[in-house]
């Protein structure tokens, strides 16, 4: 699988320095799975953060692997701090900012049907084995999308020309 290698350059004493360069290998220590995500200011603090995929636990029968993205900020010494974690659905074009308390406690499952694609978030039980569904985000397309967007307890998140994004608390 493809990898992303990131160099982080800072100006120290009027010279550029790569703060994530390994003195042993001469290669960046910032190597992660490539997920079509690029460094950006994800939390609008004026500092560019680096995306770092972290595998999420999977269901026993789930074939697809899911990842949260930890967005890391770097100090001039090369030390990294996670400033935000997100879940990205690149196929449907959305992302969700994960509450900090969810980072090690969620499972994710995806599903697609006729003109709907959804991701369900589950909170892992205290026993570590059980899980309870807490949130579903769905992208709805097709001629009947307006009606399907208000089914049950769904509420709107965003509308585009051909897609309506909704969520429901479970």
Protein language model annotation of sequence segments:
Residues 2-13, 56-80:
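Structural motif
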């Amino acid at each position: 699988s493809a990898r992303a290698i990131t160099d982080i350059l800072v100006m120290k004493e009027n010279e550029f320095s790569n703060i994530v360069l390994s003195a042993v290998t001469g290669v960046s220590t910032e190597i992660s799975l490539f997920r079509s995500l690029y460094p950006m200011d994800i939390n609008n603090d004026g500092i560019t953060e680096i995306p770092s995929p972290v595998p999420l636990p999977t269901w026993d029968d789930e074939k697809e692997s899911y990842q949260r993205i930890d967005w890391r900020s770097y100090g001039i010494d090369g030390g990294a701090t996670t400033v935000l974690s997100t879940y990205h659905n690149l196929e449907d074009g959305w992302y969700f900012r994960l509450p900090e308390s969810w980072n090690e406690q969620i499972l994710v499952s995806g599903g697609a049907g006729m003109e709907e694609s959804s991701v369900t978030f589950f909170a892992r039980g205290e026993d570590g084995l059980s899980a309870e569904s807490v949130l579903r985000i769905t992208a709805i397309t097709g001629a009947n999308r307006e009606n399907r967007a208000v089914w049950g307890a769904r509420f709107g998140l965003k509308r585009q020309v051909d897609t309506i994004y909704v969520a429901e608390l479970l």
